[in-house]
Amino acid sequence: MIILVDAMGGDNAPEAIVNGCLDAVSEADGFEILLIGDEGKIREILNKRSYDTSRIKIHHASEVITVEDTPTKAIKTKKDSSMVVGFKLLKEKKGDIFLSCGNSGALMTGALFILGRIKGVDRPAIGAIVPTKAGKGLIIDAGLNTVCKPVNYQQFGIMGSIYMKEMLGIENPKVGLLNIGAEVGKGNETLKQAYSLLSESNINFVGNVEGNDVALGKVDVVVCDGFTGNVLLKFYEGAGSYFYNLIKGIMLKNLKTKMAALMLKKDMKVLKKIMDADENGGAPILGVDGLVFKSHGSSNARTVKNVIIKASKFAETKALDKIRQEFVNMEVEDIEQDL
C-alpha cells in the first residue's frame, strides 16, 4: 500500500507532516509513504532522523496551494502544486490513498475536478469520527457543504453507514438526522423532506436526533449539513480539551489530589486519548471516486502520525467499492420503479 501525502499543506508544513510520516512508519507496518512537495525542504527534515528509506520516498512538486489561494483558481493554475500532483498520482493509481492538511476548499475542488464524483453521488461530504458514550460516532457532513438539498442528507446517511460498517465493523449502524427535536415533523422543509428520503433508504434510519444525543451515542451516524457539522465538530474538540484540562487542574490542586492523580495516572492517559483531537483527527471525503483523507490545517506531527495510520486502515477496507455499488443499485431500483 502506498499513501500519498501532501507534504506542503497545513500551517505546520513541511516539518509536522514529514515528522508525522516518520513516526507513522516507525509505529506501524503495511504501508509506504510518498511525500509530495519541495524535495530540498523535505530531504532536509528527513536527514535529521534515521528511517527506513524503502518506506518513505519523495516526489518533487514545485508549487504550494496556501489558505489564501482561491480554490478553483489554485487547482487550475498551480498544476505542479503538491495537492494537484497528489490527486493526479492517485488518479493514475500511483498510490492507494491521498492525505492532505491543506486548503479545504482546494482539496474539495481538486477531488471533484481531478477524481470526479462516484456515479450517482450529488455532493461528497467529510465524515468525522468523534468519541461517544457508546464508543465512536460519525458526523457527516463535517464541513464541505454549508447548504444542502434533501437528497444530500439521504446520500450522506448512506455513505456514512457504509463507512462505519467497513471501518469500525458496526454491522447495522444506526443513522440519525440532526434536528431541533426528535419528533417527526421537526425542522424546516428541507429537513422534513430529508427525513422522508432517509426513511425510504436501505439503511437503519432511526429518526431525528438532537445535539445532546450525539455525545450519548444514541446513533452511530449523525447526518447534517456541513455548516452545522463543522460547528458541532469544533465544539466537540474544544469541549474535550476544556474538560480534560479542568479535571487535570483539579487533580493537581493540592497534595491530597496529587496523590489521587498518581494512582489515576494510567486512567488519565486513557481519558486523554479518548478526548484528544490529535488522536481522533483526520476524516475521509466520501463520495469522490478515490480515497482521500483530510486533516486539520493546524495538525502537528502526532496528529499526522495518527491520521496516516487511520488512513492506511481505511485503504484496507472495501468502503469505496461498497459506496460505488450501493449507488449503482439505487440507480437500478429507480429505473425499475419508472418501468
From Swiss-Prot:
GO terms for biological process: fatty acid biosynthetic process; phospholipid biosynthetic process. One of its GO terms (cellular component) is cytoplasm. The keyword Transferase applies. InterPro entries: FA_synthesis, Phospholipid_synth_PlsX-like. It comes from the Bacteria. One of its GO terms (molecular function) is phosphate:acyl-[acyl carrier protein] acyltransferase activity. Its main location: cytoplasm. It is an enzyme of class 2 (transferase). It catalyses: a fatty acyl-[ACP] + phosphate = an acyl phosphate + holo-[ACP]. Pathway: Lipid metabolism; phospholipid metabolism. It holds the Pfam family FA_synthesis. Keywords: Cytoplasm, Lipid biosynthesis, Lipid metabolism, Phospholipid biosynthesis, Phospholipid metabolism, Transferase. Its EC number is 2.3.1.274. It is found in: Cytoplasm. The keyword Ion transport does not apply. Catalyzes the reversible formation of acyl-phosphate (acyl-PO(4)) from acyl-[acyl-carrier-protein] (acyl-ACP). This enzyme utilizes acyl-ACP as fatty acyl donor, but not acyl-CoA. Homodimer. Probably interacts with PlsY. Belongs to the PlsX family. This is Phosphate acyltransferase. It comes from Acetivibrio thermocellus (strain ATCC 27405 / DSM 1237 / JCM 9322 / NBRC 103400 / NCIMB 10682 / NRRL B-4536 / VPI 7372) (Clostridium thermocellum).
